[in-house]
């Protein structure tokens, strides 16, 4: 993936996103991050066949978990929580780390368009030990899980069309408020969860303190905005710490936030594009 990935048209999303995160990086530094991100993605895809080894600490693989002592959901089994993460390292693994705290969780996943491949990945995910619910445009499945007292886990660093513009790396990104709204509705905790690739197939999952609104007297919409803004700040910290472990193959910011300098940098960064040629092609 580190060789072929940067040649794909999708890599221009990587370049634009990294140019926003690291505006002072030159073309070579940006391209190095693109390669690192593709390598991490390739490793994560290969690890589906070995999720059982990772989940159970076999053959040199495993998960080290660091847990905040402030999470009530872990000490009060009847209390659900909303766990949120980003497309970092192997983003399937936080669910297993939560299950290892003797806390059941339902992981929300995006089904693939290929039914056969989707079924294969679904079988591999069984090693995580959690319930699996396909993502939907409706929040009803999430409400059903929380109503039944089950925690949910969501990946929420994507740009969404129906979200709120909240800062991420100094620029507004359309951010979903759904996790915070659900936490407020069910009076449960909103908990950021980070995963890092430490070495090969060894990982560290950090379960942070629950996120609270800045103003407890604000209305619920404003509380949700404040909470998700804090989640975005967590994402900023994680991405700066391990940028090559961030999968950002989709647009994170609106096109209009890319100014002329960004576009100039991106064009210079892509060594697989030549004037007069046919643009990016897979090797």
Predicted regions, residues:
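Residues that cap or flank secondary-structure elements
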Residues: 6, 62-63, 86, 112-113, ...
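Catalytic core of membrane glycerolipid acyltransferases/transacylases, capturing the structured
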Residues: 77-136, 161-166, 172, 197
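Hydrophobic alpha-helical segments typical of transmembrane helices
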Residues: 14-17, 94, 116, 120-121, ...
């Amino acid at each position: 993936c580190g060789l072929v990935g940067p040649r794909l048209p999708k890599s221009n999303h990587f370049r634009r996103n990294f140019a926003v995160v690291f505006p002072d990086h030159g073309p070579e530094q940006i391209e190095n991050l693109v390669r690192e991100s593709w390598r991490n993605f390739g490793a994560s895809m290969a690890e589906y066949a070995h999720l059982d080894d990772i989940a159970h600490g076999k053959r040199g693989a495993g998960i080290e978990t660091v847990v905040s002592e402030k999470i009530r959901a872990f000490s009060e089994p009847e209390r659900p929580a909303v766990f949120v993460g980003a497309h970092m390292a192997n983003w399937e693994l936080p669910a297993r780390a939560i299950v290892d705290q003797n806390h059941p969780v339902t992981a929300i996943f995006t089904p693939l368009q290929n039914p056969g491949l989707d079924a294969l990945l679904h079988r591999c995910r069984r090693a995580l030990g959690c319930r699996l619910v396909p993502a939907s445009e409706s929040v009803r499945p999430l409400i059903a899980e929380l109503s039944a007292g089950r925690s949910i886990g969501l990946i929420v660093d994507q740009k969404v069309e129906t979200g709120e513009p909240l800062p991420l790396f100094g620029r507004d990104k359309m951010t979903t408020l759904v996790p915070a709204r659900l936490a407020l509705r069910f009076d449960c905790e909103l908990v950021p969860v980070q995963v890092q690739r430490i070495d090969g197939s060894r990982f560290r999952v950090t379960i942070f303190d629950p996120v609270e609104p800045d103003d407890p007297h604000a209305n619920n919409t404003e509380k949700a905005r404040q909470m998700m803004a804090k989640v975005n700040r967590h994402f900023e910290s994680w991405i700066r710490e391990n940028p090559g472990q961030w999968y950002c193959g989709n647009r994170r910011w609106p096109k209009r936030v890319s100014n002329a300098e960004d576009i100039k940098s991106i064009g210079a960064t892509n060594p697989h594009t030549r004037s007069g040629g046919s643009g990016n092609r897979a090797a």
